[in-house]
Every structure is written in C-alpha cells, then in structure tokens.
Regions:
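Asparagine-centered strand-capping/turn motif at beta-strand->loop junctions
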Residues: 34-39
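Sec/Tat signal peptide C-region and signal peptidase I cleavage site
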Residues: 19-26
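A short, solvent-exposed beta-strand micro-motif common in secreted/extracellular proteins
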Residues: 82-92
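Intrinsically disordered, low-complexity Pro/Gly/Ser/Thr-rich segments with frequent PxxP/GP/PP motifs
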Residues: 55-80
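Bacterial N-terminal signal peptides
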Residues: 9-19
C-alpha cells in the first residue's frame, strides 16, 4: 500500500510535468511566417523584445536572403519570453527598416511592406 501511494504520487507529478511543459510550449510558441513585400531583397532579419534596447545578435535568415515576394518560416527559441517583438530587416542596398509591437503569441504570419507598415494574421 505504501509503495502504491508513492507510485501514484510519482506518476501524478510526472503527468503534471509532461502536460505542464506541453501547455507552456504551446503558450510560448512564437514561430511565424515572414513575407517580404518590400520590393527589395532582405539579407538579414533581427528580432528584439519590444521593451528591449538591443537587437538579438542572431540573424534569423542565417546564410539565406529573402527576395521580394517570397516568404520564410521563422523558427526561433526566444531568449526572452516576451509577448511583443520588433523586427528589423536589412536590405541588400545597405538600408534597413524596422517594424514594432508584434504579438507573437497570437500572430502566425507577417507581411513586411517597405512603407513601414506590416500586415499580420
């Protein structure tokens, strides 16, 4: 009986850990699809929590470029569990543009426009 209670407690704790981790991962899923509608080739994409004063050092495109009219899936593990993020795109002509306050808990697709506007869903 004593071992049964210990086993039941251990299994309950394990179930809570497994389901709690899955729920946490679902809540903090911040991956999204990024569409380039700027008219220019994007050579780098940087993300930053809206409240931060610096961009992440990691270029989300890696060695790739994002040509006009194309899209890419951004799969990242945020170092900050922030809800709102900013995006900085650097273009092949040396210029850049920034867009602000994307709720990555609820947005799954972002289309960047060169005029500083973005469409998201």
């Amino acid at each position: 009986m004593k071992h049964t209670v210990k086993l039941l407690v251990a299994l309950t704790a394990l179930a809570a850990l497994i389901f709690g981790t899955a729920a946490f991962a679902a809540v903090y899923d911040q991956d999204f699809t990024l569409m380039n509608n700027t008219g220019d080739t994007i050579v780098s994409i940087y993300l930053s929590p809206t409240r931060a004063n610096k961009w992440r050092a990691e270029d989300e495109l890696g060695n790739y470029v994002l040509k006009p009219g194309y899209e890419v899936d951004i799969n990242f593990s945020p170092w900050d569990e922030a809800r709102y993020w900013d995006i900085r795109a650097e273009f092949d002509d040396g210029t850049y543009a920034e867009w602000y306050n994307f709720d990555l808990f609820s947005i799954s697709r972002i289309t960047l426009n060169r005029n500083g506007k973005a469409v998201y869903e």
